[in-house]
Amino acid sequence: MAALSSGSSAEGASLFNGDMEPEPPPPVLGACYAGSGGGDPAIPEEVWNIKQMIKLTQEHIEALLDKFGGEHNPPSIYLEAYEEYTSKLDALQQREQQLLESMGNGTDFSVSSSASTDTVASSSSSSLSVAPSSLSVYQNPTDMSRNNPKSPQKPIVRVFLPNKQRTVVPARCGVTVRDSLKKALMMRGLIPECCAVYRIQDGEKKPIGWDTDISWLTGEELHVEVLENVPLTTHNFVRKTFFTLAFCDFCRKLLFQGFRCQTCGYKFHQRCSTEVPLMCVNYDQLDLLFVSKFFEHHPISQEETTLGETTPASGSYPSVPPSDSVGPPILPSPSPSKSIPIPQPFRPADEDHRNQFGQRDRSSSAPNVHINTIEPVNIDDLIRDQGVRGEGAPLNQLMRCLRKYQSRTPSPLLHSVPSEIVFDFEPGPVFRGSTAGLSATPPASLPGSLTNVKALQKSPGPQRERKSSSSSEDRNRMKTLGRRDSSDDWEIPDGQITVGQRIGSGSFGTVYKGKWHGDVAVKMLNVTAPTPQQLQAFKNEVGVLRKTRHVNILLFMGYSTKPQLAIVTQWCEGSSLYHHLHIIETKFEMIKLIDIARQTAQGMDYLHAKSIIHRDLKSNNIFLHEDLTVKIGDFGLATVKSRWSGSHQFEQLSGSILWMAPEVIRMQDKNPYSFQSDVYAFGIVLYELMTGQLPYSNINNRDQIIFMVGRGYLSPDLSKVRSNCPKAMKRLMAECLKKKRDERPLFPQILASIELLARSLPKIHRSASEPSLNRAGFQTEDFSLYACASPKTPIQAGGYGEFAAFK
């Protein structure tokens, strides 16, 4: 501010009050004025002085904006100076306009008008002291050579925001109203989609579009108001001590003592209070508003409805949503480089990198689990990108999960080649791709990996000589012994399984109840006459499935290849979650529903830790024992869930459309299935649990659902959840159902959030009352001898046994 007010105020006042002789205007300007009419000859000098004052005032305003315009809470002296400069600028411009109009009409000025000019110039110069060096710059302006002088437009637009706030934005040509106000709205916790903007014209508010060029509105006042249907409230902050692990929603640092909004759940440190969004927006209902507004202006025609009948994998599916769509299209992110095997989505850009190893014939020992397994990622990028979303997503839980990955991987296969896969059994060369015939020969050790490891190579090399194999005796003994844990040991010969009644059919096969050393479930897969490549790929996937052992996973017991491919799993006494929720409509208590969600997340976390993508998670594949123990089935098996052409494997749209993620429906990527696509399906399962309904129940057209979900126009209606559903569960559901794949959390975070929610629920403990003493081992005869009545129990005569004193 000191720089802005530098210079001698006395000099500025004397200059514009006539004490000093001003420099005459340029000849061109004087000639123009002289020819414009027969007015006062002193008018051109007065116009000249006013123009200099306007320029200086505008420079002061621009300097203020450059200095303090980007601050959220600018100092009060800045606001006072800004208001003073803008008011003086308005007065000067009005006076200049009057002078120019009078010159054009040839009228003469009265004494009062010249007096007012002196007053304006004097008041302006008294507050805007101008240095002599600054005046010398503007005494020879270049823009005064125009034949028709016009009033300069105002470079700013005043905007009145919700909650009695206001701001000023520069009016730049080519910049829309949305871009100009985006930062101001974001600082107040708002987005343009939930607001409407109006201009004041003739005393009335007239709506304008967000894409209007703001330079057309120079000098006008805009009013931004929140839409009526948007549930906008103010925060309800309370001070809170977080005894469980929590993180600040702004700085993402550990939070012990801070504040929390009771309405939206936003939590923060006291030092971060200035960065908290000013508005408390219910974004769940906001999504419904966007969908309803879209269909008001874009009704779906019959042609668009039939568009979903085309096969998404063929490339005919629309790929880029229109500008009115809720979210932008999902773009692949760069491939990470570190070697912790945490799941990330497949990226088509890696295919060229894999091809540098060359094309060779497929090895019979190479595991073909490339579709269900994911390359390693950078831990720092994972933590930074995923963050800690919502309550109960602690950072140490994620690090604990990473340690599980290291401890569960005894085989030496941790290296940094993007095309490698981590398994729990001792494999041959490891592949990842969508076609057979690709092979990789990873180096023995690479910098940047956690450990220097050795990997088996297909081609001859020094690493094959790690053990002497020169003697034929050793080779014969190895051939005789073989591998103890071979996948061939899990093949059940034809005729040992007794197939019973048909239970049901799904997308990839038919399930029967069978007998094989007890009750088992036999799933006959829809693969007729498998090729040798398919058969070997199927066996390789079984090599991964046979390692799954978890309380919430259906136990894999074996497989058979004759008369057709079949998977044998344990028999689950009970019904599927779909049958409970939608057929017999079992009424579960909320604590039971949360426990079912916790067990499902626990089982999926285990599968993802094994680098297995479910690909078809839904309530039909979640089974409940009689004690409500969750068992997840029908996981993995990319060989069966893909389309084969000869020896090559291709992706196809598989699964049930209600549980499909938008990127899976679009099928734009070569392999759209990822851990995040399983998370989306889990979000739909949460929706079923918390509403008791299937999503999109109001739409009967299957193709319409495929089209709208794939384009991002449709999402489940979260307003239908039960009234007693915790807010944390509703927020978790919304996170899992994000339209952008990379914005969804992973199952370690989901499991931690649900466990924290389950611990925070109020539980009614049984009181240590008299009936509990009976259960502790006392007999009724023991109480017949003593007076054990409650103080409120009326005493009856003869109720005290055989004591003579009471008779």
From Swiss-Prot:
Question: The organism's lineage?
Answer: Eukaryota, Metazoa, Chordata, Craniata, Vertebrata
SMART domains in UniProt:
C1 (SM00109), RBD (SM00455), S_TKc (SM00220)
Q: Which amino acid positions bind Zn(2+) 2, per UniProt? A: 248, 251, 269, 272
Q: Name one GO biological process term.
A: T cell receptor signaling pathway
Name the chain's protein. Answer: Serine/threonine-protein kinase B-raf
- Family statement drawn from the similarity comment of this UniProt entry: Belongs to the protein kinase superfamily. TKL Ser/Thr protein kinase family. RAF subfamily.
Q: How is its activity regulated?
A: In quiescent cells, maintained in an inactive state via an intramolecular interaction between the protein kinase and N-terminal domains. Following mitogen-mediated cell activation, binds via its RGB domain to active HRAS (GTP-bound) which releases the inhibitory intramolecular interaction between the two domains. This allows the MAP2K1-mediated dimerization of KSR1 or KSR2, and BRAF which activates BRAF.
| Required co-factors | Zn(2+)
This entry's Enzyme Commission designation comes to: 2.7.11.1
**Ranges for domain RBD:** 155-227
Task: Check the record and name the Gene3D superfamilies matching this protein.
Answer: 3.30.60.20, Phosphatidylinositol 3-kinase Catalytic Subunit, Chain A, domain 1, Phosphorylase Kinase, domain 1, Transferase(Phosphotransferase) domain 1
GO MF terms listed in the record are: ATP binding; calcium ion binding; identical protein binding; MAP kinase kinase activity; MAP kinase kinase kinase activity; protein serine kinase activity; scaffold protein binding; zinc ion binding
Which organism encodes this protein?
Answer: Coturnix japonica
Q: Which PROSITE patterns match?
A: PROTEIN_KINASE_ATP, PROTEIN_KINASE_DOM, PROTEIN_KINASE_ST, RBD, ZF_DAG_PE_1, ZF_DAG_PE_2
Q: Which portions of the chain have biased composition (kind: Low complexity)?
A: 1-15, 110-128, 314-328
Where composition is biased (Basic and acidic residues), the residues are 348-363, 463-487
Q: Which residues carry this modification: Phosphoserine?
A: 790
